[in-house]
A protein has these predicted regions:
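Membrane-proximal juxtamembrane linkers immediately C-terminal to transmembrane helices
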Residues: 114-137, 156-160, 198, 261, ...
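Short, strongly hydrophobic transmembrane alpha-helices
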Residues: 95-121, 125, 354-356, 399-404, ...
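Mid-to-C-terminal secondary-structure elements
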Residues: 6, 170, 183-207, 216-342, ...
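Interfacial "coupling" helices/loops that link adjacent transmembrane helices in transporter permeases
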Residues: 355-399, 481, 771-810, 817, ...
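Alpha-helical transmembrane segments of integral membrane proteins
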Residues: 67-98, 328-334, 362-389, 393, ...
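Short juxtamembrane loops and helix-capping segments at transmembrane helix boundaries
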Residues: 118-136, 258, 264-274, 325-334, ...
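Negatively charged linear elements and acidic catalytic determinants
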Residues: 1-102, 289, 308, 312, ...
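Membrane-proximal extracellular/periplasmic loop immediately following the first transmembrane helix
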Residues: 126-170, 282-287, 302, 522-585
Length: 880
């Protein structure tokens, strides 16, 4: 306790130094006067009395210094001295301070912004307690589980405190307002217990309410309760219709609970007796809470063993099926969202390193002008460690100022991201409503600032402290030039900056070009004249194939009669949607695969006969579907050109037969009656995959979209289209009604923003690299000014001087390109796996970007090099 009090007393001394010094001086003067008076009384003269008093006290100033040392914290006090001195030096050089702070603000700001986005998309969508104990059980590749397998996992799994299943889908909500399409989840009774959450109003599902006949209850999300029911507590207990069936609303979940995101409501998952023994249809997602003493590896080992046991017991369905256990966070992260977020984190991290390298170069340049100052401080007793600490303190001060400005820049970036993003993306991408600068972002910013300050300052500080006192005191002579090692280090920094700028600009160019090529391919479908809308026919209201077909026939006929409608079609997915393309296995007659793993796969599409004409998809061979292709006739299919060439090379695919499903499935064989041009339905594919089309009349359960090609503006038919659908079924909402070009833009806008952001970051890196080139060239020319003057006086031509001055910059550029081009090629291969149209060896990009970058670097180096040709030789000779 006494030591702690002493420490607090010493800490207080730092902030009351002037008052304490005044008190100490007064006390010392008082003691001195007392000794002088005693000596005077002893008969001494005043001069002798004062001399003897000073001798007795041991020297006033020495005593004061001893007292100060006893009551001070030397390390902290010297650190405060470094901070005060550093602030004065930064204020003394406002130009340097502004450029360094701006550079670090850009680097730290974009890192903070992307960190906040990553936290919102990859962490906050699951605002659940004890998230580390929540896991998902899959059958590999995040695939769902069959109902019978789920029941086995539930009864035999010993690693889980609670295990539940859910099935998420779009649902039609009617009653208490206009018909609305919502995203819902059918869940087992223990679902919310497994998640560790409970309703904030009403109650949760009871045991037995997930059995057929007892499942007519629903729980609302907080968002839906507010939006549709005005947050009215009286809404609980009332009845709404979900997919045509009545449900009583019994509870409201907390606003933070939206799993599986972004869910609007939850209903019980009532498995029928037939479903409970079904092992063929993998349709359930499993979520579980681990027991306190069980690790993820233990649960994974248990499920792996259970999977093997089920494979032995049920080889027909479970032979190639293996269970896996994943952290729930990893399971719910979209692979595309994660890939692009990780990509952006890597890019902005590189930008921050470039910013640190640039600030380090600035500090190298500044250190050369401070050598006299550092030499004088060393001559007065400052050790090398103290000099390094002083310069590191200044670097960290710069980084902290950059962090403060970077927070403002990050806040602006996040505002721009949220405010300018289309509502479709905000709704689809869970996490947008959670984007904010929170305590985690502030901590990240401070950590980034400290790391940046150290990275940007450590090498200049160490290099500057190596010079001897006599070298620094010869300021103005040729001995004041920096050493070869320092010059090489600065050149290495600039080389790295140019190389990184090359990689980023190439990546941005590839993304932007791929995005433009992809969206440009949509022009072939003339999307600006097509209106699309979604309809979700609930199985409870349309259980029979004939009922579904009757609805589509009526809808197509009614929509065809709209004024301005040219053609109407039903289909399951539109081009470049990335939100509805369904792939599945199939078999080729005569070449049935030995197992599911070796089975070929393709995009599966269901279309009405008018679809190819509506979307301007070319029929390359054979015929289109017709009204004669009915359920009772020969099952038929259209295949894409890629599928035909892959599985029947050198021969016609017409008349060949395929079957949807795995080797064990017993579906009908489909006869290929036509070959279509390739269409890219999912833009995350690098190339259009093989596609199989089935007629609506033979597979009506898969269609969910209607399209109308119009003469004029398709948006003008919006209200009339809704009215026609309502006239057929008043409880059926027509959702996502919009022109096709708008829908395609909304589905690809995230990629466009990624390309634009990478482009901006690439330009920032390029600007920083150009400034670095200019700085090192300007300093090199300044160092060699007298040499150039002497050369001119000795007869050197200005072209020779221009070459000598610019050679260093050209060598840096050559080294940067030698490093950057292979890295850019490697990055291009990664991007090629993310987006259609991105070629890892695009000649235009890989030729154009280096040329542009070289021109920028050449321009930056030419300005100081040209200045070298104008050196006055007489002034140089006088100096010599």
């Amino acid at each position: 306790m006494n030591r702690f009090r002493a420490w607090l007393f010493r800490l207080g001394e730092l902030f009351q130094k002037e008052r304490r010094d005044r008190d100490l001086s007064a006390e010392m003067d008082s003691h001195l006067q007392l000794h002088i008076e005693d000596n005077l009384h002893a008969g001494m003269s005043r001069a002798e009395a004062q001399r003897q008093a000073l001798i007795k006290l041991g020297g006033v100033e020495q005593t004061k210094e001893m007292v100060r040392d006893l009551r001070a914290l030397p390390l902290l006090e010297s650190l405060l001295q470094d901070i005060r001195y550093g602030v004065r030096m930064l204020l003394k050089n406002p130009g340097f301070t502004f450029v360094a702070v701006l550079t670090l603000a850009l680097g730290i700001g974009v890192n903070t912004a992307v960190y906040s986005l990553a936290e919102a998309f990859l962490v906050r969508p699951l605002s659940l307690p004890n998230l580390h104990r929540l896991v998902a059980i899959t059958t590999g590749q995040k695939s769902p589980v069959a109902a019978a397998d789920y029941l086995d996992c539930k009864t035999q799994g010993q690693s889980f405190e609670q295990l539940a299943a859910y099935r998420a889908s779009d649902m039609n909500l009617t009653g208490s307002g206009e018909p609305e399409r919502v995203y819902g989840a059918a869940v087992t009774a223990g679902f919310f217990t497994a998640l560790g959450v409970a309703p904030v109003r009403g109650r949760g599902f009871l045991i037995g309410e997930d059995e057929p006949g007892h499942d007519q209850v629903a729980i609302l999300s907080y968002r839906l309760w507010q939006r549709r029911f005005g947050a009215d507590p009286v809404a609980l207990g009332k009845t709404v219709n979900i997919d045509g069936k009545p449900y009583t609303m019994i509870g409201v979940m907390d606003r933070s609970v939206e799993f599986p995101v972004p869910t609007d409501l939850w209903i019980p998952l009532a498995l029928s007796p037939k479903e409970k023994v079904n092992r063929a249809a993998n349709s359930l997602h499993l979520v579980a809470r681990l027991k306190d003493n069980v690790s993820l590896s233990t649960a994974r080992a248990e499920m792996t063993l259970l999977g093997r046991q089920l494979a032995d017991a049920y080889p027909n369905t479970n032979k190639d099926r293996q269970f896996d256990v994943l952290p729930l966070v990893e399971y719910v992260e979209g692979s595309i969202t994660r890939a692009y977020t990780v990509l952006m984190l890597a890019v902005v991290g590189i930008v921050l390193l470039v910013a640190c390298a640039n600030v380090a170069n600035l500090q190298f340049t500044r250190a050369s002008s401070r050598r006299s100052e550092l030499a004088i401080r060393e001559a007065f007793g400052a050790g090398r460690a103290r000099l390094v600490r002083q310069m590191l303190t200044e670097s960290i001060l710069l980084a902290l100022l950059g962090a403060a400005a970077g927070l403002l820049f990050a806040k602006f970036c996040l505002w721009l991201c949220v405010s300018k993003m289309p509502p479709y993306v905000v709704r689809l991408w869970a996490g947008f409503d959670k984007i904010r600068l929170d305590a985690g972002a502030l901590f990240f910013t401070m950590a980034a600032a400290l790391i940046s300050g150290i990275l940007a300052g450590i090498l200049p500080a160490v290099a500057s402290s190596k010079h001897h006192t006599t070298d620094g005191l010869r300021e103005g002579g040729r001995g004041a030039t920096v050493g070869r090692g320092t010059r090489r280090l600065r050149s290495a920094f600039v080389t790295a900056q140019v190389a990184v700028a090359l990689v980023l600009v190439v990546g941005a160019a590839l993304l932007i070009k791929g995005f433009r090529q992809m969206t440009g391919s949509a022009e072939a479908y003339s999307p600006e004249r097509v209106l699309i809308l979604g309809v979700n026919l609930p199985a409870s209201k349309y259980p029979q194939t004939g009922e579904r077909l009757a609805f589509y026939r009526k809808a197509l006929a009614d929509l065809s009669s709209l004024p301005g409608a040219q053609s109407v079609a039903a289909f399951s997915c539109y081009p470049l949607s990335n939100n509805g393309a369904i792939w599945g296995y199939f078999q080729v007659l005569g070449r049935v695969a030995p197992d599911l793993r070796h089975s070929p796969w393709a995009d599966m599409q269901t279309i009405s006969p008018e679809y190819l004409g509506l979307m301007h998809v070319a029929l390359l061979a054979g015929r289109e579907f017709t009204s004669d292709d009915r359920e009772a006739t020969q099952p038929v299919a259209l295949v894409s050109q890629k599928l035909a060439q892959r599985y029947w090379p050198g021969e016609s695919a017409l008349g060949k037969q395929i079957r949807i499903g795995g080797p064990a499935d017993s579906g009908p064989w489909l006869t290929v009656v036509g070959i279509t041009a390739d269409v890219l339905y999912d833009w995350t594919n690098q190339v259009p995959p093989p596609t199989i089309y089935r007629p609506l009349t033979q597979a009506p359960q898969a269609a969910s979209l209607l399209g109308i090609r119009t003469v004029g503006d398709p948006a003008s038919l919006g209200q009339a289209t809704r009215a026609r659908i309502a006239s057929i079924d008043p409880e059926l909402p027509a959702f996502d009604l919009k022109p096709l070009d708008v829908a395609i833009h909304e589905s690809t806008v995230g990629l466009g923003y990624t390309g634009a952001m990478m482009g901006i970051l690439g330009l920032i890196a390029l600007a920083v690299a150009v400034v670095g080139i200019y700085g090192i060239m300007a300093y090199t020319v300044g160092e060699r000014t007298n040499e150039f003057g002497v050369r001119i006086a000795m007869g050197a031509q200005r072209e020779d001087i221009l070459w000598l001055a610019s050679r260093h910059g050209l060598l840096i550029s050559a080294a940067a390109f030698a490093i950057g081009l292979p890295a850019a090629i490697a990055g291009a291969r990664f991007l090629a796996g993310l987006i259609y149209g991105t070629s890892p060896g695009d000649p235009v990009v890989f030729a154009g970007v280096p040329i542009i970058l070289f021109a920028a670097v050449l321009t930056a180096g030419y300005i100081p090099a040209h200045r070298a040709t104008r050196v006055d030789p007489l002034a140089a000779l006088r100096y010599e």
